[in-house]
Amino acid sequence: MVLGCSNDDSPTNADTDNDTIFDNTDNCPNVSNEDQLDTDGDGLGDACDEDDDNDGILDENDNCPLTANPLQEDADNDGLGDACDNNTILPQFPCENGLANGHPCSGFDLMSHIPIADLGGAGAEGNDSWGWTDPQTGIEYALMCTTTNTAFVDISDPSNPIIVGTLPTATANSPWRDVKVYNNHAFVVSEAPGHGMQVFDLTRLRSVTNPPETFTADANYNGFGSAHNIVINEESGFAYAVGSDTFNGGPHFVNIQNPTSPIAAGGYAEDAYSHDAQVVTYNGPDADYIGREILIGSNENEVVIVDVTDKTNPVQISTIDYGNLGYAHQGWFTDDMVYFLLGDEVDEINFGLNSRSIVFNFSDLDNPEYHMEYLGPTSAIDHNGYVVGNTFYVANYTAGLRAIDISSLDSGVMTEVGYLDTFIPNDNTAFNGAWNIYPFFESGNILVSDIDGGLFIVRPSN
């Protein structure tokens, strides 16, 4: 017997693709694939397998290339096969030929609609809305305010929503009711006299077995009577009631870190009545205010920026107004906190403008500057608007939900990219139609609360 040394250049030890796997054991000897992944177990690695799931459909044509689905079913026509699509829910009313169940649309499907009478009873009108995702179950809920109550709607199947229950008004009915969410609790205010702030534990919705139930509040805060709106900074655990009967209508501070034991924490009365606000723990371009709690108030005749970090000593940073000022109503920061997009509720009425959004540059909070304005395609009044990424979602009353691309704000360009009109009769300059938008669900569901129509659940069209 002759003993010898192995030859590293022999075919047995060759590694053509230099992936540290010898060719004789490599499931893709000519394509580097150190992980040797072979989804369909056919002995051919995914890196060089043109049909990874072995269903007879080449990957380049397969709508689920890693899951066998030879029939290529795609119920919602989104290009992703049912076999690997986690979202195959179909809208009740897809946007087709510019209409979704009679509602003018572009780029948005109407998943479903709940009439206002089902939510608030006969004669009710809709107003504000917000959303909550149960962290335990992942179920998404719509919180819809009406003149009579706050309704809680399970939208886990947005095409078949379920009204789980309602929380009646604390005192009288009112056209103005507002809700926000913190730490799995809803906080509700109203302009109804003596209403105060209702606190409702949203986890109670999990145990409802015979919907709809009529709920009672878990706590009531009576540091104010009526309030137009409520704002919450979820990072700090403070709520800010605005337009209340305290502090000259300025923000009324409430510590809600223990949600069912809210504690009065002061207020700010130095500027005009505050109609709405956004409060953030600042992380924008102005280094002077990083980490500070900043309130941006839409105060009828101006926009005010206030440092509210010290609740016992809030400090005005600056104010700004603008041309053709009618009523500074509500606004929202861009995600990077460079720009603030404001809606003026009566400029369309007073000055004959189309739906207008005013944009300020807030890079320097001490010296805010007017940046640009956007005019929409209709004369509808703009109401509440919110930013998600590069899209500004606005409730434009009679013109419904409008989606505006703001990716080119630096260049002074805003472009409408979609809409779903919840008010069919017209787009007139009137107080009918969409009051609020909630565009923050991870699923892509968007809520539209409508004065006349109730709750609309929409999604971008596939």
Which sequence ranges carry the predicted segments?
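Extracellular calcium-associated, cysteine-rich motifs in secreted modular proteins
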Residues: 8-90, 94, 102
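C-terminal motif of bacterial Sec signal peptides marking the signal peptidase cleavage site
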Residues: 3-4
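Feature marking well-ordered beta-strand scaffolds used for ligand recognition
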Residues: 86-462
